[in-house]
A protein has these predicted regions:
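Internal/C-terminal transmembrane anchor helices
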Residues: 52-78
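Membrane-embedded alpha-helical segments of integral membrane proteins
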Residues: 2-47
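Serine-dependent acyl-ester chemistry module
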Residues: 4-22, 244-387
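Extended hydrophobic/aromatic segments used for targeting, binding, or gating
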Residues: 64, 202-203, 211-216, 221, ...
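Membrane-interfacial loop-to-transmembrane alpha-helix junctions, especially the N-terminal start
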Residues: 1-7, 54-59
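Conserved SGNH/GDSL esterase-like catalytic core that processes O-acyl groups on lipids
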Residues: 178, 187-270
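Membrane/wall-proximal cationic-aromatic binding patches
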Residues: 81-204, 332-335
Length: 387
């Protein structure tokens, strides 16, 4: 009965995380955990038919394995807490004026200056929403955006008429020198627009026009869909894809599972005609932003409560630590999720090559130069130094 009770508690906890904490926004992500908990329930029911000797052996193995896992979990939690504290101390030492506001606090402060400010709405926010009628490939158009903080300040930029990080007049130029596609590094996450890759390239005298169609979290399929939906009508000289080896392929694995995005892969003529559906898209994007802002408010309310109730918080912190330890938070992050990314790379490499060939065919037919820029991850060199 103990095994069955634990299995049921696990199921309820997964439901709580998926539907209450995340508001159902990431239900697809939690499917594997639902399958796991149901499997445990079935096994626990089956165990009632086993003999006492076999039950004892199984229980011994489970208890020993669980004990070992908890030791590993505690060690990983200690290491993670140390790293977080060290990073914060280093940031403050390098920049005493490092902005320590939360994303929600910064957003609300910017809203007091200009009520038009919005939070980022990104294509990846819809990757687990299989019921969305239109799949957005950009942010909320014609709005100033409060970006993230990695350098001690909250970066801002203005979305153009289609929701991309560009000066809006770039769309009116008849001949486009460069179109950029990529993820956060190309999008310009956490830096102001003049400091983005697109902003730097525009500063060169020989670059007359450039459109940055990148969005944080994008992968090759989303980028391919973006190019097909938002291809400028005038002449384009060059298209550059900036590929980041650390996370683009795992992202592609998720995109290939989405029913709308998969159509771009299967059908070269498929289009959502997003340029003509600005009103419908705006509603979908604003609803998504509203949900995420509400989640940010809840997190901020929790932080404010912590500041006002430090003694009670210390008890709650202990409870949270125990809860995270019970569900193997760090082990899942370090091992299960890490292996998922490695497996994803193997599973989708063929599709990745096919998408590149689709790019080549699509752009060659329009007499556009195609460049693939490979951005290596820093861990490649750190790992080599360790070896």
């Amino acid at each position: 009965y103990i095994f069955l009770s634990i299995s049921l508690l696990l199921l309820f906890y997964i439901f709580y995380k998926a539907q209450i904490v995340h508001g159902g926004l990431e239900s697809v992500y939690y499917l594997k955990y639902y399958y796991f908990s149901f499997s445990l329930i079935i096994l626990s029911l089956f165990s009632f038919k086993l003999s006492k000797e076999i039950k004892f052996m199984i229980s011994t193995v489970i208890i020993a394995s669980t004990f070992s896992l908890y030791i590993a979990e505690i060690v990983l939690l200690k290491i993670n807490n140390y790293e977080d504290t060290a990073i914060k101390k280093f940031a403050l030492k390098k920049n005493p004026n490092f902005d320590l506001r939360s994303q929600y606090e910064a957003y609300m402060d910017f809203k007091r200056i200009d009520e038009n400010y919005v939070n980022p709405v990104l294509p990846k926010h819809f990757i687990y929403d299989y019921n969305v009628k239109l799949y957005p490939l950009s942010g909320i158009p014609n709005k100033p955006v409060v970006s993230c903080n990695e350098n001690g300040y909250f970066a801002t930029y203005n979305n153009d008429r289609f929701g991309f990080n560009n000066p809006d007049n770039q769309w009116d130029i008849k001949t486009i020198d460069y179109v950029l596609l990529g993820d956060s590094a190309t999008h310009g996450d956490c830096v102001n627009e003049p400091d983005t890759i697109g902003g730097k390239l525009r500063s060169y005298n020989n670059v007359n026009s450039l459109l940055n169609l990148a969005q944080a979290g994008n992968d090759q399929l989303i980028e391919y869909a973006t190019l097909k939906e938002y291809m400028p009508t005038g002449k384009i000289k060059n298209v550059l894809i900036l590929y980041h080896e650390n996370n683009d392929l795992p992202g592609l694995s998720l995109s290939l599972k989405h029913p709308i995005l998969k159509k771009y892969f299967d059908d070269e003529n498929f289009s959502q005609k997003l340029k003509n559906k600005v009103t419908e898209l705006k509603k979908i994007k604003e609803e998504s932003m509203s949900k995420r802002t509400e989640r940010g408010k809840k997190q901020q309310d929790d932080l404010d409560w912590i500041k006002a109730n430090k003694k009670i918080y210390e008890r709650r912190k202990l409870i949270t630590l125990i809860r995270n330890t019970i569900v193997f938070t760090r082990i899942r992050t370090e091992l299960i999720e890490g292996n998922r990314f490695e497996k994803a790379e193997e599973d989708v490499f063929k599709e990745f090559e096919e998408i590149l060939m689709k790019y080549k065919k699509f752009l060659k037919a329009k007499d556009i130069n195609f460049y693939f820029v490979y951005l290596p991850d820093i861990r490649r060199y750190i790992d080599n130094e360790k070896k």
